[in-house]
């Protein structure tokens, strides 16, 4: 009996076990987990990112050491070579003749890496930050300090990549080729193995890396080309002296007679196309022969375009795919959800589904339209601001006073001017990012309000809230419109008369009566104008937030605008330190033929007979030598004219020596 009971118990338990196991027969077992639909699995690279970045960091440090040895060997004085290594400069921002392509590409690569830090859980690739458990049982990790450290790591990582171009040597070009190929190869390898990423959007990492890949690809082609050219033309020793091609071209363009092509045809005889071209030429930036924008302005413009792309991409992929998923998942249950809030769109549930989907599609279209409008306005204002930069720099170069509020008191460098010059590109990039974000919010609210208050009600014939409000308040709007129209008509036909060709005020009594009677109505008009003033000023400041060449504050408070203050100081440094006219004049002085060195003269106390006879012969042949000294005389006059120009041009005051202020006649100093 006991055995039977035990058998029955075992059968019962096994049966129960079989019954329980049948409950989970459709569940995935063990490691055979199925990913939900639409979820991108985490991709594992063949080589760990920590190992790749450790190799890149080591290679960059080695290249930097080799460049330091090269700079110490080539550029430092031999007697000072044992004191330390010469740190190569990544970019010479004040040089006018250097190519802007390599610095712009390096800055694009650096900024793109910083943009990729936003969704990354590991700011430093060679550190694997694991989440720590909090006392509440939740997983938390403080990544803020590591992201701040990454802001210093990436500039140090790409420092040698930019310094190889500024060294201008065959060995530097070879090191730049190896380093650029290594960076480009690692990025291509990572994106080829893992093109999709579950963070934010599956293709966001790949799309955000396009500027990075373009910049590294350009550098991986530029360095080999420069290496081949240096080997072919034997220019490995580098160029010596001042680079004067741009400064001499600027001087020739400045001194040559200008062609007045625009004045040859009257404005009345121009066609519509020519007028449009002239308007665009005066409104946006077009290249001008003989003038080149400073390197920092070119870099800031490039970074503004890159920042616009990165911010627009982030705004697009973080909202539009989510709205599309929500629209695709709408079913008849949404009618019950809306009914819970007291919203009944229709009695037919299927019609409610179609209406909700159409409204979501309208929101998506308004969002994309606002994003396109924001990007277009940013690019147009960027092109227009480049023309303003050029006009301001040309005015400072010729010594004119700029129409700035407050005006520049002096172009001498100062502490604030140097700090502003250092941070100009970074400020411009940050202002562009924030300006695009604010523009997107304002334009999206405007387009959405216009769509749901005007277009959607007119298409569906329901929810005509705007038309109903106008229907109920039409007496107010009619009164305001009539008051404004009648005041303008009375001002033109009753209170003004033309006397001897000049307008004069008349009917003063009627003018005072109308002013008193219309005071309450004008208060209503003033309230409307106040709202319009707030809207138009907000829109204007939003659109021009990314521009630093104009102040968003009134003239009396323009100095409180940090962006405008930075721009003024930036112009001060550029005008005082990279004046192309000064560089050209100094190059002409350095390249001028120097007189032949003469042997040192003996003391003048006693002359030997031979020297006395030689002096007599020189006195006799003075007239003959004066005939052949015409060329030297003209050269001396040209040098005196150059010195006079350098001394009296107000835009060149920063280049004068302080000793010239106390100079005496014939150059003798006290």
Swiss-Prot record:
Cytoplasmic side: 72-97, 166-168, 227-296, 390-423, 496-510, 549-670
Signal peptide coordinates: none
Lyase recorded as keyword: no
MF GO annotations: retinal binding; retinol binding; retinol transmembrane transporter activity; signaling receptor activity
Expression triggers: By retinoic acid. Synergistically up-regulated by Wnt1 and retinoids in mammary epithelial cells.
Sites of Phosphotyrosine modification: 644
Phenotypic effect of disruption: No visible phenotype at birth. Measurement of the eye diameter indicates a tendency towards slightly smaller eye diameter 6 weeks after birth, and this difference persists in 5 and 10 month old animals. The retina inner and outer segments are shorter in mutant mice. The number of cone cells in the retina is reduced, giving rise to a reduced cone response to light stimulation. The retinal pigment epithelium displays discolored regions, where cells have large vacuoles and a reduced melanin content.
UniProt PTM comment: Phosphorylated on tyrosine residues in response to RBP4 binding. Phosphorylation requires the presence of LRAT, suggesting it may be triggered by the uptake of retinol that is then metabolized within the cell to retinoids that function as signaling molecules.
Subcellular localization: Cell membrane
Side Extracellular, residues: 1-50, 119-144, 190-205, 318-368, 445-474
Subunit structure: Homodimer. Interacts with JAK2 and STAT5. Interacts (via extracellular domains) with RBP4. Interacts (via cytoplasmic domains) with RBP1.
Domain notes: Contrary to predictions, contains nine transmembrane helices, with an extracellular N-terminus and a cytoplasmic C-terminus. Besides, contains one long helix that dips into the membrane and then runs more or less parallel to the membrane surface.
Role of this protein: Functions as a retinol transporter. Accepts all-trans retinol from the extracellular retinol-binding protein RBP4, facilitates retinol transport across the cell membrane, and then transfers retinol to the cytoplasmic retinol-binding protein RBP1. Retinol uptake is enhanced by LRAT, an enzyme that converts retinol to all-trans retinyl esters, the storage forms of vitamin A.
UniProt protein name: Receptor for retinol uptake STRA6
Annotated organism of origin: Mus musculus
Organism ancestry: Eukaryota, Metazoa, Chordata, Craniata, Vertebrata
